[in-house]
Structures are given as C-alpha cells and as structure tokens.
C-alpha cells in the first residue's frame, strides 16, 4: 500500500497521491490521464478527482498500479465499486483486466470473451476480486502469453481455471517449462478460426502477437502507440533480442488487417484498417531510421 510519509511533493494537494515507490510504468497515466501526470521520472497527481467518472478512473488506477504506489489520505468508501468495474470493457467483447503485476513491470492484460472459450492475454496479478469477475464472465480457456517478460502469475491462473497456457518455445524459461502449448517456428498458428498467433521475434526471440477476429491485435511489447511521437512505434531501447529481426517482424505484421493495437506496455491505438496500414508503414519507416 502507498505510504503518506512517502508522498511525492509533485502531487497537488488533496486526498489522492502517488508515493515514491512508483516505478514509472505509465499505467495510471493512461488509465486516468486527467488525474495523473509525469514529473521527474515518476507519476504524480496533477488534478484531484472532481466528478464521479474521475473518481472511478482514479480508483481503477489505484487497483491497477503494480506497486500499490497510489493512495488516499482518507480510506475510500467506494473501492468495491471500482473492484466491480473490472475487467473494463474496451470494445465489444474485449476487456482490460487491470490489476497489473510488478513481475511484468506493470504490463497490461486483456480478456477476450468468446463462445468457444475465453482467452486471457498475458497475466495480470492473481487478485481475488479480478478472479471472481473472470469467473462470472465464463472463466479462462486459454492463457496466451506474448513473451517471457509478461507471464507474471500464470501458474496461479492455470491452477484456478485449468486453462491451457500458450508461449513460444524460444521464450520458455525456468518458470514456464510446464506451459501446455509451446509454439515452434516462425509460421503463423491458427489457434481457432478467429484466433491467429503471429511470431514476431525482436523484443525477445520468442515474442508473438495475437490477432483476434481480424480486428484486434494484442501486441505485448512488440508495438504500441507513442504519445510523444504521435505514431505507432517499437521500443528500441528495450529490444532484448534483435532490432533488425524486429523490423523484419514488423514488415510481416504490416501485411495483416486490424483496427486495434492493444499492447502490454505503451498506449493502445484504434483506427480503421486503411489508416492503420498507413500507420504501420510510418512505424516501419521510423524503425529503419533508428
């Protein structure tokens, strides 16, 4: 939990605050951009919530924060309402799970609700309120893991829901040797007619992305929207395997049609398919110039 004695001086006065344990993962800033900002490489409260919507967004950020670095001076009486709001709908049957894990440096996790079995994309924290909500939405059939960095509490979700975990063999480590479906090679894998897994080595050797319904692309740490650059981009400074390979992977990915980019880290992006193709080309041009 956040500690008032460690409250950052960059916070504005008021009930809500960020303490000095913040790891600058950006979660609160994109979940509640009217409330949180960045100052001196950490988050801070720039504006105290004034409306019910702002209050809910702020408490959702409190729950999602992977390091429990956000607190309130007065114990919140409306936290159960915030807990019940997760997972948060994004579009149609796609949800943001919240409850980010410090084990994955605060990466976002998502849920695809589908008649043939729900898919949990990357692992959130194994938090009781979230688990209860996932049960109410139909449980978890597959736990798809984009890459080795964002596996977090995968074992607990597997034990609770009996879900099959999916991870590329090149990203299997000591904590994931028991993963049920270990992908191999560089060819796309059709898990189901509406689920296509595309290997995209670069950030890690075994990184993959998941395309759902030819509309929603779950990108892990391969691709995200940059607010600073105002375009899609890749993370050159944290490319652990190969930047040239990541460029090749992005070229392959540019051949697919999709409308949403939902990343583990970075900001999400939505555009029509034609515009998204243009944004992908701009991303490639930028990558090749680095």
Say what each PLM segment does:
Residues 16-32, 52-68:
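Cysteine-centered iron-sulfur cluster-binding motifs in ferredoxin-type domains/subunits
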Residues 103-104, 114-142, 175-179:
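Pre-active-site segment of Zn-dependent metallo-hydrolases
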């Amino acid at each position: 939990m956040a500690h008032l004695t460690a409250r950052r001086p960059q916070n504005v006065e008021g009930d809500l605050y960020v303490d000095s344990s913040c790891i600058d993962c950006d979660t609160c800033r994109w979940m509640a951009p009217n409330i949180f900002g960045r100052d001196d490489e950490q988050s801070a409260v720039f504006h105290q919530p004034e409306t019910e919507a702002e209050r809910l967004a702020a408490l959702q950020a409190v729950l999602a924060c992977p390091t429990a670095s956000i607190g309130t001076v007065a114990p919140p009486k409306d936290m159960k309402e915030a807990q019940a709001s997760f997972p948060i709908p994004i579009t149609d049957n796609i949800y943001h799970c919240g409850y980010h894990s410090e084990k994955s440096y605060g990466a976002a996790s998502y849920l695809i609700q589908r008649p043939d079995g729900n898919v949990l994309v990357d692992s959130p924290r194994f938090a009781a309120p979230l688990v209860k909500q996932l049960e109410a939405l139909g449980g978890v059939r597959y736990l798809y893991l984009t890459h080795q960095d964002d596996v977090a509490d995968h074992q607990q979700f597997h034990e609770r829901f009996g879900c099959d975990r999916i991870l590329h063999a090149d990203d299997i480590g000591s904590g994931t040797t028991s993963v049920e479906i270990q992908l191999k090679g560089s060819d796309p894998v059709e898990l189901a007619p509406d689920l296509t897994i595309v290997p995209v080595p670069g950030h890690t050797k075994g990184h993959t992305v998941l395309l759902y319904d030819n509309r929603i692309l779950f990108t892990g740490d391969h691709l995200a929207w940059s607010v600073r650059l105002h375009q899609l981009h890749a993370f050159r400074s944290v490319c652990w395997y190969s930047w040239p390979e990541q460029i090749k992977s992005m070229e392959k990915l540019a051949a697919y049609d999709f409308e949403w980019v939902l990343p583990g880290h970075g900001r999400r992006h939505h555009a029509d398919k034609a515009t998204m193709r243009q944004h992908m080309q701009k991303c490639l041009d930028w990558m090749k110039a680095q």
